[in-house]
């Protein structure tokens, strides 16, 4: 493995400034086409993550997804045994007619010993569980920089596990942690997957908002590797908000329209925070609004003729309008 230059632990906090500039750029040069309807020539499934209904059970997530018209479920693996039981997931899938679209590996900060404390074995177990449950994608976060050899060999190791198991391991974009005027770079090789040699990626709108990323530009850059989208929103807060799509300031509608227009192939999974909601009816409205948003902007809400656009290529002709790159210094 080639030597990597270790990035500094802290950098200047620029997320809010970037977010502000991006909003101003979109206001000056809107890219959303309100009168146009696009639908990818490939089927795009809209799923519901179990994290969107927490603390409800996996069974309740399947039932809610079925009731609201979702196409499938993403299961976040936690300490809860039912999230680690592929047979149970398969039974829920059979009972509701909804497949397990994806499994989220327990790679979060508070899950170091879920399944096993061995990081590579954890990914292998997750991939095997996903395959047994009928899912074709595992979502995972990049390592923390203190996770030793796992972090140093992450890019090549993820590819090896994917090849061994036949399951796609789609690495998710994250964000720098914040401390006053500084950003702490806790992820390795980076919270931003753009410059890493991954085969498969997941894009999360809330993480992008917290990081100050340009969602449209990023999706254009990673289009060929993008397998999975976490549908949510953010308002540029330093916290990972996971708002209902359309309730933040990210160009979520524009990005979904872009994916449909250029015939993207993958799954979109709603991952919104409903933990603060006390009434089940309020939670269901948030989840119903989320799938309605997805179906509208992916062209799935009605009989929309498929528009055969040119295949996506990495040219200025097909990329969304972008703002000038921000000066990092």
Q: Predicted segments — roles?
A:
Residues 90-106, 156-166, 191-196, 252-255:
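Alpha-helix-loop-beta-strand connector modules within alpha/beta enzyme cores
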Residues 165-171, 199-203:
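Short, structured loop/turn "capping" segments at alpha-beta junctions
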Residues 71, 75-152, 265, 274-277:
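Structural motif corresponding to the early beta-alpha repeats
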Residues 57, 85, 118, 122, ...:
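Soluble or luminal CAZymes and related metallo-dependent hydrolases
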């Amino acid at each position: 493995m080639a030597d990597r230059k270790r990035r500094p632990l802290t950098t200047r906090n620029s997320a809010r400034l970037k977010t502000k500039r991006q909003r101003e750029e979109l206001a000056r040069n809107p890219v959303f086409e309100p009168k146009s309807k696009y639908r990818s020539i490939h089927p795009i499934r809209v799923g519901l993550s179990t994290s969107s209904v927490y603390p409800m059970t996996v069974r309740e997530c399947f039932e809610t997804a079925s009731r609201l018209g979702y196409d499938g479920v993403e299961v976040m693996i936690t300490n809860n045994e039912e999230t680690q039981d592929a047979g149970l997931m398969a039974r829920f899938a059979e009972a509701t007619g909804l497949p397990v679209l994806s499994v989220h590996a327990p790679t979060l900060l508070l899950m170091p010993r879920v399944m096993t404390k061995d990081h590579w074995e954890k990914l292998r177990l997750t991939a095997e569980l996903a395959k047994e449950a009928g899912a074709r994608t595992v979502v995972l976060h990049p390592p923390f920089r203190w996770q030793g050899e796992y972090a140093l060999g992450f890019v090549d190791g993820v590819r090896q596990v994917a090849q061994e198991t036949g399951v796609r391991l789609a690495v998710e974009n994250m964000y720098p942690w914040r401390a006053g005027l500084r950003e702490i770079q806790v992820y390795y090789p980076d919270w931003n997957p753009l410059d890493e040699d991954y085969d498969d990626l997941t894009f999360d709108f809330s993480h992008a908002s917290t990081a100050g990323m340009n969602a449209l530009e990023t999706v254009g850059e990673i289009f060929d590797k993008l397998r999975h989208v976490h549908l949510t929103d953010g308002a540029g807060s330093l916290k990972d908000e996971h708002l209902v799509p359309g309730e933040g300031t990210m160009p979520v509608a524009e990005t979904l329209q872009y994916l449909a227009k250029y015939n993207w192939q993958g799954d979109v999974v709603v991952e919104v925070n409903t933990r603060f909601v006390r009434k089940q009816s309020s939670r269901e409205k948030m989840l119903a609004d989320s799938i309605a948003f997805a179906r509208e902007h992916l062209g799935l809400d009605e009989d929309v003729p498929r528009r055969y656009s040119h295949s996506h290529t990495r040219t200025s002709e097909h990329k969304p309008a972008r703002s000038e790159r921000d000066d990092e210094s």
